[in-house]
């Protein structure tokens, strides 16, 4: 098993709950896990896998004050790693996640697991999907 970084930004606690479930799934699969807010990230070079969590903000966009600048810093190091995405949204269909997946593809970042999204607070099914995501990238 490898070393996994679960990196997230959460405004209301919904994406944080998802991040905790991803970390729990990765640990249960035997991985060494660091659970980090985007403000704590110093790079991803020491990790085999990276799970990134961010809620939809504004008009279906990534949070641009802390998360997006951090993402732009680590993106060059993500190709070749196991990468997965997750997050929550309040309205619409979760289009921000589809845009984020397309952004990854444009930058040569292959996703190792299906992305997980939750409408507002994650329900039991979303939390189970987050645990499975964590296990899959471990």
Q: Where are the model-predicted features located?
A:
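FMN-binding flavodoxin-like domain, especially the glycine-rich phosphate-binding loop
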Residues: 2-4, 14-17, 21-39, 46-138
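Aromatic-flanked redox-active Cys/Sec active sites in thiol-based oxidoreductases
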Residues: 8-12
């Amino acid at each position: 098993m490898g070393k996994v970084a679960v990196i997230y930004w959460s405004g209301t606690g919904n994406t944080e709950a998802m991040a905790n479930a991803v970390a729990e799934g990765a640990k249960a699969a035997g991985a060494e896990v660091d659970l980090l807010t985007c403000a704590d990230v110093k790079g991803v070079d020491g990790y085999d896998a990276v799970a990134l969590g961010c809620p939809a903000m504004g008009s279906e966009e990534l949070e641009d004050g802390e998360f997006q600048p951090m993402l732009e810093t680590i993106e060059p190091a993500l190709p070749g790693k196991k990468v997965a995405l997750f997050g929550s949204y309040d309205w619409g269909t979760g289009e921000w996640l589809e845009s984020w997946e397309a952004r990854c593809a444009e930058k040569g970042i292959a996703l190792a697991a299906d992305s997980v999204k939750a409408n507002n607070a994650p329900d039991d099914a979303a939390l189970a999907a987050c645990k499975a995501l964590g296990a899959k990238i471990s």
